C-alpha cells in the first residue's frame, strides 16, 4: 500500500511497468550486494538492509513481472528466480545461523536478472 501511494505521488511514469521492473531488479541487485556483509558476526544493519531490499523487490515485482512475462517469458522466469533466491537469502528479521544462499550465487542471479531485462528496459530505467 505504501509503495502504491508513493507511486501515485511520484514523477510521471513512476508507475510504468517497465520502470517498476527496473526498480525491482535494482532492489534484487542491492540485496545481493548486501549478502556478503550480512552473515553472523557481521553488522546487523547489513542484513536488515538486504532484507529490506528483498522485501521491496517482492512487493514491487507483480506489475513488472506481469508486463515482462507478456513480452519475454524466459526473462520473467530469470527475474522471478533471482527474486526467489533473494527471499530465501533473507528469510526473516533474524540472521540465519547458516546462510541459505551463498553470496556469489546471489550476485550471479542478480546479474542474470539485470541482463534479462536489458533489452526491455531503457538505460535510464535501470
What are these regions (language model features)?
Residues 1-126:
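Mature extracytoplasmic or organellar-lumen-exposed domains after removal of signal/transit peptides
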